[in-house]
């Protein structure tokens, strides 16, 4: 009689989840343990790099890791799908139906048995229930969101470049508001200016960083609150030297299609 393997299911293939299945696979292998990763994306990219993907400074295809090749190397199995529910009584996770781009079902809803279950689903941006944010704002939570931001940025830059070609005196700008002065917001603001300076070499001859208007809005008294005051102040000064408008002590109360509304009515 074949001995039943101990089944360890890890849901979420972010930095924590993918490192866990790698270590479990390396330590236990496939002989007596069945290690399974459930992840809704096909590739992994380190989340702190998403601002570089969004700004166009990093080609994610060169830095991402494909789960299928990674699982083969490290001794675990990969299930492409999204967690729908957990059946604790029967020791199962239920994966939602897998649909294609047209909404047709590829894989029906199904369950995976577990002896040990690890939820490593990570975090997502909190919109704090602010009206209009879900409808009108972009979030840097994953590779797909970073790609959407980059594509929208390039489209706006192309529009401004074309407008300036037709009318060199046009007051055309790409305006970006970044809500949150933490590490991601600050790094994204700086990277946007670096990327804008390079666009002229990629077909947008009349576009440069002077046509970019970036604002960082932070509700707290200063940006980079996790850092000591001195390096945070230095980063603030560097952003302003690039041309970034840094607003501290400002809380966003609503978002509209082409503007944000602050609590003080600005």
Please place each PLM-identified region on the residue numbering.
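Conserved N-terminal Rossmann-fold NAD(P)-binding element of oxidoreductases
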Residues: 11-12, 119, 179-180
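Beta1-alpha1 glycine-rich phosphate/pyrophosphate-binding loop at the start
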Residues: 2-85, 183-227
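Predominantly flavin-linked oxidoreductase catalytic cores and closely associated redox partners
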Residues: 135-238, 242, 246-248
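A conserved beta-strand/loop element that lines the FAD pocket in flavoprotein oxidoreductases
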Residues: 75-87, 240-255
């Amino acid at each position: 009689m074949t001995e039943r393997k101990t089944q360890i299911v890890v849901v979420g293939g972010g930095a924590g989840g993918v490192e866990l299945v790698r270590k479990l696979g390396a330590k236990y292998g496939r002989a007596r343990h069945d290690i399974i990763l459930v992840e809704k994306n096909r590739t992994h990219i380190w989340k702190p790099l998403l601002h570089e993907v969004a700004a166009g400074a990093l080609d994610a295809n060169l830095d991402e890791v494909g789960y299928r090749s990674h699982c083969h190397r490290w001794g675990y199995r990969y299930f492409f799908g999204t967690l729908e529910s957990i059946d604790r009584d029967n020791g199962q996770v239920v994966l939602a139906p897998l649909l294609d781009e047209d909404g047709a079902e590829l894989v029906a809803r199904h369950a995976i048995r577990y002896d040990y279950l690890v939820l490593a689903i990570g975090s997502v941006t909190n919109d704090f229930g602010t009206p209009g944010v879900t409808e009108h704002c972009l979030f840097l939570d994953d590779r797909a969101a970073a790609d959407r931001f980059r594509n929208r940025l390039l489209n706006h830059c192309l529009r401004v470049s074309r407008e300036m070609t037709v009318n060199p005196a046009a007051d055309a700008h790409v305006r970006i508001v970044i809500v949150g002065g933490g590490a991601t917001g600050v790094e994204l603001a700086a990277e946007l200016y670096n990327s804008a300076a390079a666009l002229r070499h990629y077909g947008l001859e009349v576009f440069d960083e002077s046509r970019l208007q970036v604002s960082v809005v932070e509700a707290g008294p200063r940006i980079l609150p996790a850092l000591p005051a001195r390096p945070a102040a230095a980063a603030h000064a560097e952003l302003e030297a690039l041309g970034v408008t840094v607003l501290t002590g400002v809380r966003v109360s609503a978002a509209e299609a082409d503007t944000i509304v602050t609590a003080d009515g600005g």
